[in-house]
C-alpha cells in the first residue's frame, strides 16, 4: 500500500495567487498521474509541517498559519474531491486529523518518533511505546561497501571518520553517533 505525500516538507509557504495557481495545477497533474494505481491507499498533504507550524518553529508571519490551513485543509481536499474522491486524504504527517490539534499525539492519527536517533535514547526505548500508527521512525546506517566503492577506491576512506565518509554524511556528528551505538 502506498502512502503518497504531496511534495511539501519541513517548510512554510506564502500563499500568493500565483503560488496557489501553481500548486493547484501540480496537485491536478500528480493526482491524474497516480490516482489509478491499485496500491494507492492515501494522499498526504505534507511531511512534518503541521507539527512544526504548531510549535512555532518555522512561522515568521501571522499569515503563514492561515495559508497553511488553506493549502492543506481546503485546496487539496477541494482538488481531490474533483479528481480522486475515493482515495483517503490525510492533511499532514504526523497529524491527528488537522487544524493543529496535537499533531504528534500517540493515541490519534500518526506519529513521528525520533527520540532514539535525535535524542540518543537506547534502542530499548522503542519498546516503551505503543503508538496508534508510527509513520516515521528510524536510525541511520552506514552505506553498504558496494555503495561506498562508487565514491572511492581507497580502502582507507572506508573508515567512518575518513574525509570521504564525513563529507558524505548529511547529519552533523552522524558517523560518531552510529559508532557509539555500535560499541
Language-model features: where?
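Active-site-adjacent substrate/metal-binding segments within catalytic domains
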Residues: 1-10, 20-42, 169-183
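Aromatic-lined substrate-binding rim segments of carbohydrate-active enzymes
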Residues: 1-20, 86, 102-124
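Hydrophobic faces of well-ordered beta-strands that scaffold small-molecule active sites
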Residues: 2-5, 45, 90-91, 133-135
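Active-site neighborhood of glycoside hydrolase catalytic domains
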Residues: 13-104
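Short, low-complexity, polar/charged sequence segments that are solvent-exposed and flexible
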Residues: 22-23, 61-65, 108-111, 134, ...
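Substrate-binding clefts and catalytic carboxylate motifs of secreted carbohydrate-active enzymes
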Residues: 78-81, 97-100, 115-183
Amino acid at each position: 500500500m502506498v502512502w503518497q505525500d504531496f511534495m511539501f516538507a519541513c517548510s512554510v509557504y506564502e500563499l500568493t495567487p500565483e503560488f496557489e495557481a501553481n500548486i493547484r495545477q501540480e496537485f491536478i497533474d500528480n493526482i491524474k498521474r497516480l490516482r489509478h494505481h491499485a496500491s494507492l491507499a492515501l494522499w498526504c498533504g505534507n511531511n512534518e509541517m503541521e507539527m512544526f507550524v504548531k510549535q512555532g518553529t518555522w512561522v515568521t508571519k501571522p499569515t503563514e498559519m492561515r495559508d497553511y490551513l488553506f493549502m492543506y485543509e481546503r485546496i487539496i481536499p477541494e482538488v481531490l474531491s474533483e479528481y480522486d474522491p475515493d482515495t483517503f486524504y490525510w492533511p499532514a504527517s504526523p497529524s491527528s486529523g488537522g487544524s493543529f490539534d496535537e499533531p504528534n499525539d500517540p493515541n490519534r492519527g500518526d506519529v513521528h518518533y525520533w527520540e532514539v536517533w535525535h535524542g540518543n535514547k537506547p534502542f530499548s526505548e522503542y519498546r516503551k511505546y505503543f503508538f496508534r500508527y508510527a509513520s516515521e521512525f528510524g536510525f541511520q546506517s552506514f552505506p553498504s561497501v558496494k555503495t561506498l566503492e562508487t565514491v572511492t577506491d581507497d580502502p582507507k576512506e572506508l573508515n567512518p571518520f575518513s574525509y570521504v565518509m564525513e563529507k558524505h554524511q548529511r547529519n552533523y556528528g552522524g558517523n560518531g553517533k552510529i559508532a557509539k551505538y555500535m560499541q
